[in-house]
Amino acid sequence: MASRGRKLGKSVHSAAQRALCDLMIAARKRAGLTQQALAARLSKPQSFIAKYETGERRIDVVEFIAICRAIPADSAAILAKVAKLV
């Protein structure tokens, strides 16, 4: 399936995926949270945060919303920035 003439690949290393990771890292840091602190808020291991922040794994939309609420971060603003790259 294509969007705006671009193929949507499954690569976790796409520009949009990297942008999402970078925006999530920036939001966490702006909130003054460590990976460990955010993980505790989500009842997840620190490795969960590390893996999506490094692009080792993707997060689904439900996880994304939960993470944004835990930070807290504006999920709509983050998605709007990522959408420009898709």
Predicted feature locations:
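N-terminal flexible/basic segments that precede or flank functional cores
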Residues: 1-22, 26, 30-31, 73-77, ...
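Hydrophobic transmembrane-helix microenvironments that flank and shape a buried ionizable site
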Residues: 19, 50, 57-60
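Residue-level signal for the short linker/turn that defines the boundary of a DNA-recognition helix
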Residues: 22, 32-33, 59-62
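Alpha-helical residues within the helix-turn-helix
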Residues: 29, 40, 69
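Residue-level detection of the helix-turn-helix DNA-binding "recognition helix"
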Residues: 29, 43, 54-56, 83
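Short alpha-helical DNA-recognition segment
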Residues: 32-52
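DNA major-groove recognition helix of helix-turn-helix/homeodomain DNA-binding modules
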Residues: 62-78
